[in-house]
A protein has these predicted regions:
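Glycan-recognition and catalytic cores of secretory/periplasmic carbohydrate-active enzymes
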Residues: 1-377
Length: 377
């Protein structure tokens, strides 16, 4: 029997209440970016739209699990809508604690999470305004950010100029996640068509020689030098789950095969054999590049194992879920209830100086997936 209840109980009874009590800025009806180890908020660098969007998802999804969650999610969404929108389209990167503009650049990563938040808020409340936010953001992305070489431009600076540095796979992954979510909550095929285009981009450009690359040139060739050789096991696992989800929705067997290729690479090279944790970074040849371990890749691995358990004949996936949950409690979910070790060295020593709100999204997603299969949904 999977130890799902242990993780869910920790999340619902410990983590969610802490972030609702200590991580929610009642004065400004939005969420703080980070908490100190004594759970006091860190407010010096304002608030990113990314964090508000992720917390909208988290507290919307678990609205029935804790009092006040739904209200907090809705008020954070209102804060996003009234304070974080850019006047010429899309979403600014960062605002002050009170919501005044602080960084008017528009990162594709932020735009993707604004779409996702709109989809999740619509699913939770049925409010057409939430759906409109997601649709309007997608229209901005398509009209203003389409790149001639495929995909979308990375960043529009505060002065309106398009940033011409390296391109990343990660914002495209989260946009894929967002449009899949929109299709699932609306049934509108136009969102599925966007997902199909992003799948083709990923298959043809972002996955090279059976590994998911992180950084690319303007024409979506792997970046020169070591940046083009870096791969992240956590992002591989994130894509495993997404590709299985896409395969289920679209009946695309090739997506299942691709998911298996990424999954097998991580199983072969991505785990610390001594601790059972997922490394931060490898090279494309499977060589260890960074032995540190962030919290979020461990949660994405749980989601990937769930997908393999559901959609393949992998008879070891269930054992990997059990081991992954045990590993979380051994190395990350320790200390004061509701806290975690965000980033640890190979020996398990924490070296990250706070609790970032952005990680709650990863925990929520993993718990939600585990709870879903535990309930037989």
């Amino acid at each position: 029997m999977l130890p799902i209840k242990r993780l869910r109980d920790w999340f619902v009874a410990d983590a969610l209440p802490v972030w609702l009590e200590k991580g929610y800025d009642r004065q400004n009806q939005s969420f703080h970016e980070r908490l100190n180890f004594d759970f006091t908020p860190i407010t010096c660098d304002g608030k990113r739209v990314l964090v508000q969007a992720r917390q909208v998802y988290t507290y919307s999804f678990f609205a029935n699990s804790i009092d006040g969650a739904s209200d907090a999610a809705q008020s954070a969404f209102e804060f996003m809508y009234t304070k974080c929108r850019h006047p010429t389209g899309g979403w600014r990167h960062r605002v002050t604690r009170e919501g005044a503009p602080l960084d008017d650049s528009r990162d594709l990563y932020d735009q993707a999470f604004a779409v996702f938040a709109g989809a999740m808020a619509y699913r939770a409340t049925g409010r057409e305004e939430a759906l409109a936010v997601a649709v309007d953001t997608l229209e901005y992305i398509e009209a203003e950010r389409a790149h001639p070489a495929g995909g979308y431009t990375e960043l529009v600076s505060a002065d309106g100029s398009v940033h011409e540095g390296l391109r990343r796979q990660n914002p495209h992954m989260h946009l894929f996640e967002a449009v899949l979510a929109l299709f699932e909550v609306t049934g509108d095929d136009s969102f599925l068509q966007r997902a199909e285009r992003l799948y083709e981009l990923t298959r043809s450009k972002l996955i090279v020689d059976n590994t998911l690359r992180e950084y690319f040139t303007d024409t979506l060739e792997p970046a020169p030098g070591y940046l083009g050789e870096i791969v992240e096991p956590g992002h591989h696992m994130e894509w495993v789950w997404l590709l299985h989800r896409y395969a289920k929705v679209t009946k695309t067997p090739a997506a299942t095969v691709l998911a298996g290729t990424l999954y097998d690479f991580v199983l072969a090279y991505g785990y610390d054999a001594r601790t059972g944790g997922l490394y931060d970074e490898l090279t494309t040849r499977g060589e260890l590049h960074c032995s540190h371990r962030r919290l979020w890749p461990q949660t994405e691995a749980l989601k990937a194992h769930v997908a393999r358990l559901e959609h393949t004949s992998d008879d070891l996936a269930e054992a990997r879920i059990t081991d992954g949950i045990s590993n979380l409690f051994k190395y990350h979910l320790i200390g004061v209830p509701g806290s975690w070790r965000e980033h640890i060295r190979q020996g398990g020593e924490n070296f990250y100086g706070c609790y970032p709100a952005s990680s709650l999204y990863h925990l929520a997603f993993a718990v939600g997936e585990l709870e879903r299969i535990g309930n037989g949904d």
